[in-house]
Amino acid sequence: MAARVLVIGNGGREHTLAWKLAQSTHVKQVLVTPGNAGTACSEKISNTDISISDHTALAQFCKDEKIEFVVVGPEAPLAAGIVGNLNSVGVRCFGPTAQAAQLESSKRFAKEFMDRHGISTARWRAFTKPKEACDFIMSADFPALVVKASGLAAGKGVIVAKSKEEACEAVREIMQGKAFGEAGETVVIEELLEGEEVSCLCFTDGRTVAPMPPAQDHKRLLEGDEGPNTGGMGAYCPAPQVSKDLLLKIKNNILQRTVDGMQEEGMPYTGVLYAGIMLTKNGPKVLEFNCRFGDPECQVILPLLKSDLYEVIQSILDGLLCTSLPVWLDNCAAVTVVMASKGYPGDYTKGVEITGFPEAQALGLEVFQAGTALKDGKVVTNGGRVLTVTAIRENLISALEEARKGLAAIKFEGAVYRKDIGFRAIAFLQQPRGLTYKESGVDIAAGNMLVQKIKPLAKATSRPGCDVDLGGFAGLFDLKAAGFTDPLLACGTDGVGTKLKIAQQCSKHDTIGQDLVAMCVNDILAQGAEPLFFLDYFSCGKLDLRTTEAVITGIAKACKKAGCALLGGETAEMPDMYPPGEYDLAGFAVGAMERDQKLPQLERITEGDAVIGIASSGLHSNGFSLVRKIVAKSSLEYSSPAPGGCGDQTLGDLLLTPTKIYSRSLLPVLRSGRVKAVAHITGGGLLENIPRVLPQKLGVNLDAQTWRVPRIFSWLQQEGHLSEEEMARTFNCGIGAALVVSEDLVKQTLQDIEQHQEEACVIGRVVACPKGSPRVKVEHLIETMQINGSVLENGTLRNHFSVQPKKARVAVLISGTGSNLQALIDSTREPSSLAHIVIVISNKAAVAGLDKAEKAGIPTRVINHKLYKNRAAFDTAIDEVLEEFSTDIVCLAGFMRILSGPFVRKWNGKMLNIHPSLLPSFKGSNAHEQVLDAGVTVTGCTVHFVAEDVDAGQIILQEAVPVKRGDTVETLSERVKLAEHKIFPSALQLVASGAVRLGENGRICWVTED
C-alpha cells in the first residue's frame, strides 16, 4: 500500500470516486481538490488546496507529492486540456484529452461525429444566428423542440420546449440573452424523441470497451417528474428496461462505434464514456455524450463495482483494459436519492447545519456529500445539491425502501428530495410478460404470404436442369440435363454494399435485385462459367411485404436476364437487428463450364496482348460509401436533378442505375476460345481487379482517352476532389469488364461482342511489369474527366474539375497572446486554404493565445519549459506532441524560446517564423528600437524558414512598412503587426501548397507551373 491518488472536483461524484479508490489495497492516500466536507478528513481521504486551472503548478504538485495518477471528475477541466497537459509532462491522468472531450464540450461536434459514423441520434441542425434557428423550428418536418447550447453549460444547457413558440423563446434566451454565456454562441436544434431515457456508461482505453450496468437519472425536482430541471435528483442501477441483449447492442452500435470512430479520426478516447440514450420504438438513439461519470449516476454505479477501481484505472492508462475487464456485483440493485437545499435549482441558502450521518451509516447506507462544508467542526450546506443517500440491496424495491430510511435519519432545514426514485423501473418490472412470437417482432404469417407471392416469379426462371418450386428444404440442379459433359463448378457470393442505403432513402427497391444478381454472376463469368442457379438472402428488422416483394421481383427478373434459375433463398425477419425501413441483401450464384474452357488461361497471356473494355452502365455496385459521403457534402440531394450532361433523371435514380449483367452477351465470345482472361471490374476498381487474371510478371497500360467515361464519374471527381489513383482504385470509371485477347484476334472479338449489343473497345495492352512496379497504369484519366466536366465559355473550354491537394497539418507555437495566431486561424478557415491548424502549443499556461485557440475549437497543450532540465528535453516534449498530431508544418507566432539544434534540423524546411524587420537588417529581440535608433524611413517584417542561427533562415516573404515622424516603439510595432497579419498567412499558404520549399542546397526554391 503505497500509491497516492488525486481526485479533481467537489461533488458527490468525486466523493464516490475517492471512497471507491480508498477501498483499494494499493492506495495509501486519496487527495481531493477542492473537495467537500465528506472528503475532508477520513482515514485515507483528505482535501488539498491546489489550483486546477494552472496545469503547470498542478503538474509540479503531483510530482512533488508523488501522485500515481489524477482522476478528473467534472467536465470543464477535461475540456480545458488538463489530461493532455499533465500527460505531456509525465503525470498520468485518467480521462479524455481536450480533443476527445469535444464529444461533450461541443454538441455540434458530437452530432456531426455521430452522423459520420452512423450512430443513431435525433435529427438536428446547428445555428449561429437566432432567426435561422427559429425559422428552422417553425418549418421542420419533425418536432424540433429540443434546444441545446453547443458548449459546456454545467449540465443545464438543454431546454425541452412544449411548443415551437417556447422553443424559439429558448433560442433567444440562449443566443441573445446569453443565458449560458459563450456556450450558447452556437445552438443545436434537435428532434424531440419519445421513450425512456437511460444512462449507458463504459470504461475504455481507446480500443476496448467495458460497459457498466445501465442506470437511470431523474432530472425533475419533484415527484412524478414534475417541476424544473436539475442536475439530477436521484438514480438507480441497473435499469431493468435495458436487457442484456439491448445492452450488447448499445455497446456494439454506440459505445464501441464511438471509440473506434475517435481512434480513426486521430483522437483516441480514454477514460469514461457516458451515452445518454433514449429508448425509442425505433431502437436506442443517443441524446448526448458526456466524457466522465454522471452525477448522481456515479453514486449508484461504483458501489456495484466488484473490481478494484485503482486496478481498472491503471489498466486503462496502460492500454490493457482487455486484460483486466471490470467485474460487477450480481443480483444487486443500488438507489441513490439527492437531498437538496431549499430553493434549488434557484437561489438557496448556505450554512445550514446537517445532522444524522451516524444514524444513516448505522443503517448500512452510504452518504456521499456534495454541496457541504465544515464550519466550526460541523457539517453545513454549501450548495444546491447537498448530498446523496445510497442503498445497495438485493432488488430495486428493497434498495429504495432503505434509502428512504436514510432520508428520514439525515436532517437539515428546508431539505428537498424525491421519494419516488426508480418509479419507472418498478412499473416496468410489474408489467405482465406474456408475449407471442409476433409481438416479439417476427410475423410468420407475413412471411408465408411473401412466399406465395414470389413463387410464380421464381417459377418463371426455370431452365434446363432445374424446375423451380419454392418451399422445399433445398433445391436440385441436373448438370447432365443442362448439357454439360465434363464440367467444373464455379461459385460466387456477394452483396450490394451501401448502394442499399440510397435505394432505401429513395424508396426505390425494384432495381437493387439486379445489382445483387449481376455482382455474383459476373464474378463467376470471369471463370468462364455459365450461371446455373442463384440463391438470395434478404434480412430485415420488420418485414414490409411491398418492399420485399419489389426486391425479390427484381432478383427474379435479373435471373432471367442472366439465364439462371432462382432456385431458393432465405427471408429473415430479425427484430432489433435493423432499424425500420432498412434491410440487407446477399446472393450466391453457382455456374459451370467445360473443363477445357476454364478462365483465366494464364499460360497463354503474353506481352502485347490487347485489353478490350466492356462498357459499364454506370457506377455498378462499388464505391458507394465514398459516393454517399460526396453527395452529403455537395449541394445536391438524391431527389435533385442529376448533374448536367447526366440525363433527365434525379441524382438518386442515376446512382441506382443497375449493374450490367454480362453472361448472355459474353458467354458465346468466351466459348469461342479467343479470350484468354476476363476481369470483372468490381470492388478495387481498375487497379485491383485486372491483376487478378494476369500472370505475376505482367501488367497492363490503359489509356482513358480510348473509352467513354460516363459524366457521373466526372461529377464525383469534382465534388470529392478525388485523385486519379483514388478514382481508379474505387470505381470502374466506365469499364464493367476487361477481356484479354491476342492482338490478331481483336477485330473478330470486337465484332462478336457488338453483335450482342455490348459497347466495347480496345483500352490498353499487356506489358511486362518489373517487381515492385504498379500492375495497372491508367493514363489520361483525370484529363478525360475534366473534358467531360467542362463547359463552353466565351468560345473556350473552361475546366471545372481539379484534384484538391491534401491540406497541410499545422502546429502553432506561442508564448503569450500569439500575436499572429488569430490571423493564421482566420486564413486557414478560408475554403481556398491549403493548411489546417491541428494544435496550438504554449510554453506558458493561461495566456491569451490559448483562449483564441480554444474559442476556435483548436486543441491546445501547455508544455512549461521550466519543468525540463534543458532545452533538448523541452524540445523533445514539443516534438512528441507534434508527432502525435501528425504535424506537417510548424509556425512560431510569438514563441519566445530558442530551439535546440537537433529540433531545428529535424524540422528544417518545415518551420516558419516571422521577424518584425526587413531581414537581414535589425536582427534580435529589440528590432523596433534598432530601427528608430538608426533613423531609417522604412522597416517591415519578414517570414523565413527557421535556421539554427537566430533570424538567419531563408526568406519567404517580406512586407515594407513606413517609419513615420514621431513614431515610438509602440506605434511602430502596431503598424508592423498589421503587415505581419497579412504576410504570415500568405507565406504559410505558399509552403503548404508546395509553391515554396527549401532546396537541398539550403536555398529557397520556387516551384512554378508551365
Curated annotation (Swiss-Prot):
Its cofactor is Mg(2+); Mn(2+). The modification N-acetylalanine is found at residue 2. SUPFAM superfamilies: Formyltransferase, Glutathione synthetase ATP-binding domain-like, PreATP-grasp domain, PurM C-terminal domain-like, PurM N-terminal domain-like, Rudiment single hybrid motif. Residues 434-809 are annotated as: AIRS domain. GO terms for molecular function: ATP binding; metal ion binding; phosphoribosylamine-glycine ligase activity; phosphoribosylformylglycinamidine cyclo-ligase activity; phosphoribosylglycinamide formyltransferase activity. GO terms for cellular component: cytosol. Residues 111-318 form the ATP-grasp domain. Mg(2+) binds at residues 288, 290. It catalyses: 5-phospho-beta-D-ribosylamine + glycine + ATP = N(1)-(5-phospho-beta-D-ribosyl)glycinamide + ADP + phosphate + H(+); 2-formamido-N(1)-(5-O-phospho-beta-D-ribosyl)acetamidine + ATP = 5-amino-1-(5-phospho-beta-D-ribosyl)imidazole + ADP + phosphate + H(+); N(1)-(5-phospho-beta-D-ribosyl)glycinamide + (6R)-10-formyltetrahydrofolate = N(2)-formyl-N(1)-(5-phospho-beta-D-ribosyl)glycinamide + (6S)-5,6,7,8-tetrahydrofolate + H(+). The modification Phosphothreonine is found at residue 682. Pathway: Purine metabolism; IMP biosynthesis via de novo pathway; 5-amino-1-(5-phospho-D-ribosyl)imidazole from N(2)-formyl-N(1)-(5-phospho-D-ribosyl)glycinamide: step 2/2; Purine metabolism; IMP biosynthesis via de novo pathway; N(1)-(5-phospho-D-ribosyl)glycinamide from 5-phospho-alpha-D-ribose 1-diphosphate: step 2/2; Purine metabolism; IMP biosynthesis via de novo pathway; N(2)-formyl-N(1)-(5-phospho-D-ribosyl)glycinamide from N(1)-(5-phospho-D-ribosyl)glycinamide (10-formyl THF route): step 1/1. (6R)-10-formyltetrahydrofolate binds at residues 871, 896-899, 913, 947-951. N(1)-(5-phospho-beta-D-ribosyl)glycinamide binds at residues 818-820, 977-980. ATP binds at residues 190-193, 197, 220, 229. In the N-terminal section; belongs to the GARS family. In the central section; belongs to the AIR synthase family. Trifunctional enzyme that catalyzes three distinct reactions as part of the 'de novo' inosine monophosphate biosynthetic pathway. Homodimer. NCBIfam families: purD, purM, PurN. This is Trifunctional purine biosynthetic protein adenosine-3.
